[in-house]
């Protein structure tokens, strides 16, 4: 159930995508404790020491978030980390910027809360509200989750049904705002005009300075792929710099050299070395173009366009409000 609520609460974050709060300024917000967008709505004051349950720890314009509300969000995030990685995870520091996992979790929760508050404020401007049945559904889910929380946790973490219901309602409203924006978006991709292939990729980034070095490295990897008894996937797992290995790539991809090479591959065929603006690729085809793959590729394109569109829309919303975050909150963990 703890992971169930988190899945509900991160829905908006997934819609907004990898940009966090909708702009690079959000990361700066977390580090500098304050964003000033030069907007008309200045951020309210927040408490920077001796936090109590009713202390304001986040301000998005005049809208504030209490320490109690923040702790409710954080409770579910913390439990998800621990259910997967164990309680010792909080002791470790990441290599990047020497942040602890606890600090990363705090920043993740802060971004999520700021997103929801920004979208909620824009919903008020646009007069978008939850219908009665939508509010009842959010409250029912909040009650279901609340009843599943151990009494000890409710007491020690100060979790209240009223606060949890508010969180669920605001997240549902944020999802509704996303759906409203997507309803305005016109995307026209006819599946039968698309060509795509499912491939395994090896990718290494390159720039003007290291281009030749990376090219030579990838040439050696290509030789390894063609001569090794190991599968392409096994080699890719150890050599790629991409986040994943398997991708669906088609003729609408902005990486035109890669797209052209991929859609021309036969099943189980490996490409030559492919140069793109961002680096070098080697592709291995595991499924050639078909009606089902065209539809999958279309859905992928639509999802990408939706995310891109909402990121831009959210950026215009977030620019309307100053944001402040409690220094005491950021200093925790």
What are these regions (language model features)?
Residues 1-103, 312-333:
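Short, low-structural-confidence N-terminal segments
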Residues 50, 112-116:
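Short acidic alpha-helix initiation/capping motifs at coil-to-helix transition points
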Residues 127-134, 231-236, 271-273:
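Surface-exposed patches in mature extracellular/periplasmic domains of secreted proteins
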Residues 112, 123-124, 276, 287:
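Short, structured surface segments that line ligand/substrate-binding pockets
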Residues 55-63, 95-110, 119-129, 154-164, ...:
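Second-shell loop/turn segments in exported
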Residues 91-101, 114, 120, 129-150, ...:
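Acidic helix-start/capping segments at beta-turn-to-alpha-helix junctions
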């Amino acid at each position: 159930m703890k992971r169930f609520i988190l899945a509900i609460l991160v829905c908006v974050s997934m819609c907004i995508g990898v940009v966090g709060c909708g702009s690079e300024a959000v990361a700066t917000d977390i580090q500098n404790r304050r964003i000033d967008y030069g907007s008309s709505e200045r951020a309210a004051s927040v408490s920077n020491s001796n936090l109590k349950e009713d202390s304001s720890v986040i301000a998005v314009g005049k809208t504030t978030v209490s320490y109690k509300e923040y702790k409710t969000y954080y409770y579910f995030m913390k439990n998800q980390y621990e259910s997967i990685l164990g309680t010792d995870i909080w002791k470790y520091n990441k290599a990047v910027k020497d942040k602890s996992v606890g600090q990363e979790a705090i920043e993740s929760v802060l971004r999520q809360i700021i997103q929801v508050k920004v979208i909620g404020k824009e919903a008020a401007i646009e007069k978008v509200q939850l219908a009665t049945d939508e509010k009842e559904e959010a409250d029912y889910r909040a009650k279901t989750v609340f009843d599943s929380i151990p009494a000890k946790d409710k007491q020690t973490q100060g979790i209240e049904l009223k606060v949890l219901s508010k969180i669920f309602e605001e997240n549902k409203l944020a999802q509704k705002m996303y759906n409203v924006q997507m309803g305005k978006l016109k995307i026209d991709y006819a599946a039968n005009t698309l060509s795509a292939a499912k491939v395994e990729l090896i990718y290494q980034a390159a720039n003007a300075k290291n281009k030749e070095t990376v090219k030579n490295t990838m040439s050696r990897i290509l030789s390894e792929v063609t001569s090794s008894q190991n599968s392409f996937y096994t080699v890719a797992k150890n050599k790629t710099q991409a986040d994943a290995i398997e991708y669906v790539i088609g003729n609408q991809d902005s990486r035109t050299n890669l797209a052209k090479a991929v859609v021309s591959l036969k099943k189980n065929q490996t490409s030559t070395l492919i140069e793109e603006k961002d680096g070098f690729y080697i592709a291995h085809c595991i499924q050639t173009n078909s009606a089902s793959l065209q539809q999958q590729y279309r859905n992928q394109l639509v999802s990408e366009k939706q995310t891109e569109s909402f990121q831009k829309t959210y950026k215009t919303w977030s620019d309307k409000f100053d944001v402040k975050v409690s220094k005491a909150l950021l200093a925790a963990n």
